[in-house]
């Protein structure tokens, strides 16, 4: 397979591990060891990497790539981002209410009346639950909870993410309908 047409970042190579060319790899897969199941991985320049071995090690996976046989070669890979093509992701294994994060980026956030709140620009998990970042030109990005109450429906075909403004914290319970990031701050005396 040539360089991915629709690249999805699967991992990033970290520091060398040992003297035989192994590297520490941070994966972005549900199962970190699944990195070995995707076949060839590619860097941003299109160079391919074949996983020969992968084993867990604390918060990363230790990987041995074909052709990387010593510590110097392994150290040269530090910081390399690894990609696959979007078509290689196992869509058939997802439940109806599961999505790949990459498929949510760029969706338009709208409420039931059709009011737009921006596009999904990022997803975060800071430990308290997933958050969606909504960006709108000329405005500061907003974070909303990625919960069923705040985001009751996702339609990939239409390219929309239905938001419930109150549950998402986009509208206060009082009459003020401005999002939290646009409210006026009290003047200092």
Curated annotation (Swiss-Prot):
It comes from the Bacteria. It comes from Brucella anthropi (strain ATCC 49188 / DSM 6882 / CCUG 24695 / JCM 21032 / LMG 3331 / NBRC 15819 / NCTC 12168 / Alc 37). Signal peptide: none annotated. It is found in: Cytoplasm. The keyword Chaperone applies. Keywords: Chaperone, Cytoplasm, Ribosome biogenesis, rRNA processing. Residues 170-189 are annotated as: Disordered. It holds the Pfam family RimM. Belongs to the RimM family. GO terms for cellular component: cytoplasm; ribosome. An accessory protein needed during the final step in the assembly of 30S ribosomal subunit, possibly for assembly of the head region. Essential for efficient processing of 16S rRNA. May be needed both before and after RbfA during the maturation of 16S rRNA. It has affinity for free ribosomal 30S subunits but not for 70S ribosomes. This is Ribosome maturation factor RimM. Residues 96-169 form the PRC barrel domain. One of its GO terms (biological process) is rRNA processing. Binds ribosomal protein uS19. One of its GO terms (molecular function) is ribosome binding. The keyword Transit peptide does not apply. The PRC barrel domain binds ribosomal protein uS19.
């Amino acid at each position: 397979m040539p360089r991915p047409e629709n690249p999805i970042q699967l991992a990033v190579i970290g520091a060398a591990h040992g003297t035989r060319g192994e590297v520490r790899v941070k994966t972005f897969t549900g199962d970190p060891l699944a990195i070995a199941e995707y076949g060839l991985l590619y860097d941003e320049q299109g160079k391919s990497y074949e996983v020969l071995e992968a084993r867990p090690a604390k918060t990363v996976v230790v990987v041995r790539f074909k052709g990387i046989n010593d510590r110097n070669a392994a150290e040269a890979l530090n910081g390399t981002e690894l990609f696959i093509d979007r078509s290689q992701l196992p869509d058939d294994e997802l439940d109806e209410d599961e999505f790949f994060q990459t498929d949510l980026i760029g969706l338009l956030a709208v409420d039931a009346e059709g009011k737009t709140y921006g596009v999904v620009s990022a997803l975060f998990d800071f430990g308290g639950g997933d958050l969606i970042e909504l960006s709108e030109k000329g405005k500061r990005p907003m974070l909303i909870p990625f919960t069923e109450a705040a985001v009751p429906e996702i339609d990939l075909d239409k390219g929309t993410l239905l938001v419930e403004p109150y549950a998402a914290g986009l509208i206060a319970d009082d009459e003020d309908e401005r999002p939290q990031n646009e409210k006026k701050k009290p003047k200092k005396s």
